[in-house]
Regions:
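Acidic-aromatic substrate-binding/catalytic surfaces of carbohydrate-active enzymes
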Residues: 179-278
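Well-ordered, non-membrane alpha-helical segments in soluble/globular domains
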Residues: 64-79, 105-126
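Broad, structure-driven detector of short, well-ordered beta-strand segments within folded domains
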Residues: 177-184, 282-294, 348-350, 368-390
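Active-site-adjacent pocket scaffolds in enzyme catalytic domains
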Residues: 1-82
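Beta-strand-rich recognition/accessory modules
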Residues: 62-77, 87-94, 272-276, 322, ...
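Aromatic- and carboxylate-enriched substrate-binding clefts and catalytic-loop regions
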Residues: 1-35, 89-100, 107-109, 130-156
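Surface beta-strand/loop "capping" patches
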Residues: 145-182
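Acidic (Asp/Glu-rich), glycine- and aromatic
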Residues: 192-196, 275, 282-286, 294-344
Length: 416
């Protein structure tokens, strides 16, 4: 649940970046390795990093020629992240000498281990000679990082699959208030969300509640909480939208697409390619735009109807977030959570009791969940006219909470 690239840890929780000088712990932290932001998310983190032995352990090499182009492609994709971070990209190989011994400790022969190390270092060395890489000590880098980055400047990565031959794309965003992952294979759904805003005090070690678990809790985590596809009890944790027409329903999680990154002032923008949604008697071309305004602690999601086969048709749009909290695949106690709807001064609340209840409010200004266990509130609002806000509690077999808005949308309209 922490950053994938260097950050300034906050005093209260080292996984959450500091938002200002008062929260600054005084150090610059670096990740142990630079890992594949798709393969390590979907699979084993020890197989896909810029440590040659990781790549060998993942068996991502030619057994006859002992070549491993994936290692170089991984380094190059990290180099490309400068496009999303104001000209800055970071990469490292951090390993001890133990894996170069001849004691049979590793999965591959010593000769291959030695060759992979030398080849990896040579690749960095050649980049340096070409003027494409600057090598620094950790102390030098800490000074560079503080000079280069502001506290609230986010780290961004539009990452694509370079291993399995798919077109899958993820976008990662990290700042002092949240870490989010947008999955283009699921129509731009948010599939991982960590609410750093609380800078949660989370003691770890012997004599604490968390002997070994230092993870920052999630609100959404598709691997541990099933994501879009789960059992018959409904969605796992995900932030997505459904379109409904004449009794048919399509979730954007089923609409694969691609994204393009841009920046306007202090806002990072993800523009997704339009998707076609086919109902029995209607086809809708819809585009999604996801915006992250620096320092706002908010994510803006716009849906644009570009075209309809029947220009006079109207479809229902259900924007929703299914969330919970935790650090593992095992559910936590949801008692104590409060769900609410707000319209002007009218606030209606529902205390979570696993009773599968629902509550809605026409023209709601906001729907909200307060999760005291992780000192976090998550809310949703919309600019859609006549939208109905709703909240739902789950039950023991599906211990989630849902916030959402139902509205109508027509051809050429935009809802955010």
């Amino acid at each position: 649940g922490g950053p994938w690239a260097p950050w300034i840890p906050s005093k209260q929780n080292t996984h959450a970046p500091a938002a200002n000088e008062a929260e600054d712990s005084g150090v610059v932290a670096i990740p142990h390795l630079s890992r594949d932001l798709l393969a390590c998310y979907d699979g084993n983190g020890s197989n896909f990093g810029t440590h040659p032995q990781n790549v060998l352990r993942g068996m991502i090499y030619d057994t006859k020629t002992w070549e491993y182009p994936y290692l170089y492609n991984l380094i190059d994709q990290y180099r490309s992240l400068e496009k999303y971070n104001n000209g800055y990209a970071y990469n490292m190989m951090f390993v001890g000498p133990g894996w170069l011994n001849k004691m049979g400790r590793w999965e591959q022969p010593y000769e291959l281990l030695k060759k992979s190390y030398e080849d990896g270092m040579k690749y960095y060395g050649d980049l340096k000679k070409e003027g494409k890489l600057t090598d620094m000590t950790m102390a030098e880098f800490a000074d560079y990082y503080r000079q280069k980055k502001t506290y609230t400047e986010p780290e961004c990565a539009l990452w694509r699959d370079i291993l399995y031959g798919s077109d899958k794309q993820l976008f990662w965003y990290c700042d002092p208030f949240m870490r989010a992952c947008v999955n283009m294979d699921q129509g731009g759904a948010i599939v991982d969300l960590r609410p750093y805003a609380a800078k949660l005090e989370w003691p770890v070690g012997i004599g604490t509640k968390h002997v070994t678990d230092a993870s920052y809790p999630f609100l959404i985590q598709e691997k541990y909480r099933a994501g879009y596809f789960t059992h018959y009890a409904g969605e796992g944790t995900v932030r997505s939208a459904k379109l409904k027409h004449n009794g048919e329903e399509v979730d954007l999680c089923l609409c694969r697409t691609k994204a393009h990154f841009s920046q306007e002032g202090s806002t990072r923008i993800l523009t997704l390619d339009p998707v076609d949604i086919e109902f029995y008697d209607l086809t809708v071309k819809l585009q999604t735009i996801v915006s992250f305004e620096e320092g706002s602690s908010a994510i803006k999601i716009e849906r644009k109807i570009l075209e309809m086969s029947d220009p006079n048709a109207e479809v229902e749009l259900n924007e929703y977030i299914v969330a919970c909290y935790g650090t593992t695949e095992y559910s936590e106690d949801m008692m104590g959570i409060t769900l609410s709807t707000k319209k002007g001064d009218e606030v209606e609340t529902l205390d979570y009791e696993y009773k599968c209840r629902e509550m809605e409010k026409a023209d709601a200004d906001e729907v909200r969940a307060v999760i005291p266990q992780i000192e976090t509130a998550v809310s949703m609002s919309t600019n859609a006219e006549g939208a109905v806000g709703y909240v739902k509690e789950g039950y023991a077999f599906s211990p989630m909470l849902t916030l959402g808005y139902n509205s109508k949308i027509k051809d050429k309209e935009v809802v955010a």
